[in-house]
Amino acid sequence: MKVLSFIVAAALLGLTGASSNSSPGLLKSDGVVLGDWESAYQKASSFVAGLTTDQKLALITGSSVNSTNGSFSGLTFLDGDMGLQNFFYVSAFSLSSALAMTWDRDAIYAQAKAVGSEFYNKGIQVVAGPTSQPLGRTPWGGRIVEGFGPDPYLNGLASGLTAKGYIDAGVIPGAKHFLLYEQETNRTGGGGGGGGDSGSAPYSSNADDKTLHETYLWPFYDAVKHGLGAVMCAMTKVNGTLSCQNSDLLMKHLKTELGFPGLVWPDTNGQSSALESAVNGEDYGSSSIWSTSTMETLLSNGSLSEARLDDMAVRNLMGYYYVNLDNGLQPEEQSEDAYVDVRGNHSKLIRENGAKSMALLKNKNALPLRKPRVMSVFGAHAGPVLGGPNTAMDIEGSGPTYQGHLATGTGSAQASLPYLVPPYVALTNRIIEDGTMMRWVLNDTYSSSSTSGLITEGTDSTAVDPSFADYATNSDACLVFLNALSGEGADRTELYNDDQDTMVNTVADNCNNTIVIINTVGPRLMDQWIEHDNVTAVLYGSLLGQESGNSIVDILYGDVNPSGRLIHTIAKNESDYNVKICYTAQCNFTEGVYLDYRYFDAHNVTPRYPFGHGLSYTTFSYSDLNIEKPSTLSKYPTGEKAVGGNSDLWDIVGNVSVKVANTGSLDGAEVPQLYLGFPTAAQQPVRQLRGFERVEIASGKQSQVTFQLRRRDISYWDVPAQQWLVASGDYKVYVGASSRDLKLNGTFTVQTSS
């Protein structure tokens, strides 16, 4: 996404309020209560009421406005969740998928606030994030690394916390990509995944109303509830209509049902018609399609109403006033190479969150490392890329792995690394302290040469034909580093890699303590070597940002006890996943709500590692399940229409609590997870995540964990009624350490009244 300039208010004079609108999707229509957005609405509508038509058109097309009401200067959008893109003296944070793997509300919020503060201090007003979609419908999706994972509940909480963090830093959150944007292939038509216009139509994501609400709209409810000020409509189609001119999506669902008060702006090439976009819900544009002269014509011939123009103008200013950018305190916008260092102490946060996100999937007492005498390191992912740290990474045409340490995304998800600590550097710093001898092959395929050699035990010469086997032999620990690359512009072509898997097996054949470390953009299969007797541990994570190597080494040596959890299921075979990349113009979401673990559970497919899985260096036990069931509830919500949907959806209607004890010898953090099974009549998945808490517990101590159930957590979408319905009947309660490791279970019964 490019930097876009549009209008912001630099001054406000006392003006009368604008009258309320009466058409669905217009602010103040259908009785949507704005709550704490009311002050922003009064300021924005008063300002717009004093503008001429030409000035309103200037406002929604990105031109400056000078009037008796005050002056407007450019407000900018910029990627993204991982930090400011293409700027000097900024931080490169973990990607959203890594942050979600912490399962830590505080960590998610803290990073968002830190990212937001860097945007604010560089003079940028809008973060193009949170990236609520791609959700992760298919593990082959090229951009799923940018989001919070395929579970709507986890994704929603993370989206909401991210929006709140940006707001508290003083900038406007702009969620993307709305809606059902789940792959790169054919996103611009003609089979391409690039950002340019291919000259033919993009694919259409076709989903039924139940799937739309229970899976893909769900995270946006959370983001809107927590103060979302902008939404980027996707460049693709939904149910046959382009997202940026889709009235059902923008006017009905987003602006009316969810009560979204902010502006909608298009992704690159998301606009194809000014009229269709304007009347159906888009509020801002800067392309030649959305020009002042075009909009004037639409007004003059009656195609575009004055009421809708006013609504667009007001919405362009809602987020600006909501986060108090009108107070004049934000620093002026800086050039990309300006020496304005906004990083503060964020490197510490990045390192901590990176370590929190790493999931220990397997451990045969190999970790933590205990001052190994000889350690060998393998894989390109362990060391730096030859030129760096920043390279212009255009994923289209790139290979499935990265020849260097992969710590940030590509395209819109590529952070500006001020430096990068690869594992090789972090390990070197550690072994100097410990007196360890380290050997390395920083490549995934190794061709020997007569000019390279290895000092071997029992000889005073060097081997003339060294190999992975030579380096692995006589090592106390062998660390094998793997990565998987994808990103904007192209989908994944594989979920495992032959070269890397051969490397693992070769090392393991010659080293009885082979530890595999993976940083990946999505599910990475490992059945090619996971059952090898000498593969003793697997550490698994996403892309961790500038402190990546330090975060990994903190876990390897036990300075941090691992607590990360999977946000996707790792299958045994590619064929175990039910959704592949769609190569046709019509992409039918026939799987419905059955993504990831929901599909595996429904079809009794045994995963290699389940959703929510992650080990620790200590052990935990669960006991004392207690359920405070909901009282009698109305079948449908009866609250007011509000920002974030019907106000009743957010009511706390019940609680589930358990005791978790640390039964091991080390302090550590556990992530107990709550899953619900709905009454049979609701026709829902076997289990759905409906609560989690990351709790730090000292050795020998215990903690009581309480999960609050909101009304929406026990509701499903009633298509005929077009409302969220609470089913009468028995709900099954499961609490455990993953979607398959369920320690405790119970039931509660809900009675509903009409």
From Swiss-Prot:
Compartment annotation: Secreted
Highest taxon of the lineage: Eukaryota
Enzyme Commission number(s) of this protein: 3.2.1.21
An example Gene Ontology CC term for this record: extracellular region
Signal peptide: 1-20
Region (Disordered): 186-206
GO molecular-function term, one example from the UniProt record: beta-glucosidase activity
Keyword annotations from UniProtKB, A to Z: Carbohydrate metabolism, Cellulose degradation, Glycoprotein, Glycosidase, Hydrolase, Polysaccharide degradation, Secreted, Signal
Ranges of compositional bias, category Gly residues: 188-198
Catalytic reaction equation(s): Hydrolysis of terminal, non-reducing beta-D-glucosyl residues with release of beta-D-glucose
Alphabetical list of Pfam families matching this protein: Fn3-like, Glyco_hydro_3, Glyco_hydro_3_C
Active site: D267
Function as written in the Swiss-Prot or TrEMBL entry: Beta-glucosidases are one of a number of cellulolytic enzymes involved in the degradation of cellulosic biomass. Catalyzes the last step releasing glucose from the inhibitory cellobiose.
Protein name per UniProt: Probable beta-glucosidase D
